[in-house]
Amino acid sequence: MENIISLLALKNDPTSATTGAGLVAVGAGLASIGNFGTGLGQGLSAGRAAEAVGRNPEAIKKIRSLMIIGMAISESASLYSFIIAILLVFVY
């Protein structure tokens, strides 16, 4: 915890501008990791939906609607992490 506090103190120090910029870049990179999980989850969801349609073609409308709802919910996490990364880069 002391390391985090000392890093925050370095960020606010005007003489260490490069340290602050580096911390912002690291934070934006960590926020972008959220996009990895979303892409993986959406790919698995689409694959399972294609499998389900292959096994039961009559249920394509229900499967498609459930898949779209699930992808929209998982996409919201990706959008939040993207917005945080953009805010870190352009605001700080």
Swiss-Prot record:
Q: Which InterPro entries match?
A: ATP_synth_csu_bac/chlpt, ATP_synth_F0_csu, ATP_synth_F0_csu_DDCD_BS, ATPase_proteolipid_c-like_dom, F/V-ATP_Csub_sf
Listed under GO cellular component are: plasma membrane; proton-transporting ATP synthase complex; proton-transporting two-sector ATPase complex, proton-transporting domain
Matches recorded under CDD domains: ATP-synt_Fo_c_NaATPase (cd18184)
Q: Where is this site: Reversibly protonated during proton transport?
A: E75
User: Where in or outside the cell is it found?
Assistant: Cell membrane
Segments spanning the bilayer are: 20-40, 71-91
Show the GO MF annotations. Answer: lipid binding; proton-transporting ATP synthase activity, rotational mechanism
Give UniProt keywords alphabetically. Answer: ATP synthesis, Cell membrane, CF(0), Hydrogen ion transport, Ion transport, Lipid-binding, Membrane, Transmembrane, Transmembrane helix, Transport
Membrane topology reported for the UniProt record: Multi-pass membrane protein
- State the NCBIfam families in the record: ATP_synt_c
HAMAP family, per the entry = ATP_synth_c_bact (MF_01396)
The Swiss-Prot or TrEMBL record describes its family as follows:
Belongs to the ATPase C chain family.
User: What is this protein for, i.e. what is its function?
Assistant: F(1)F(0) ATP synthase produces ATP from ADP in the presence of a proton or sodium gradient. F-type ATPases consist of two structural domains, F(1) containing the extramembraneous catalytic core and F(0) containing the membrane proton channel, linked together by a central stalk and a peripheral stalk. During catalysis, ATP synthesis in the catalytic domain of F(1) is coupled via a rotary mechanism of the central stalk subunits to proton translocation.
| Subunit-structure text | F-type ATPases have 2 components, F(1) - the catalytic core - and F(0) - the membrane proton channel. F(1) has five subunits: alpha(3), beta(3), gamma(1), delta(1), epsilon(1). F(0) has three main subunits: a(1), b(2) and c(10-14). The alpha and beta chains form an alternating ring which encloses part of the gamma chain. F(1) is attached to F(0) by a central stalk formed by the gamma and epsilon chains, while a peripheral stalk is formed by the delta and b chains.
**Protein name, per record:** ATP synthase subunit c
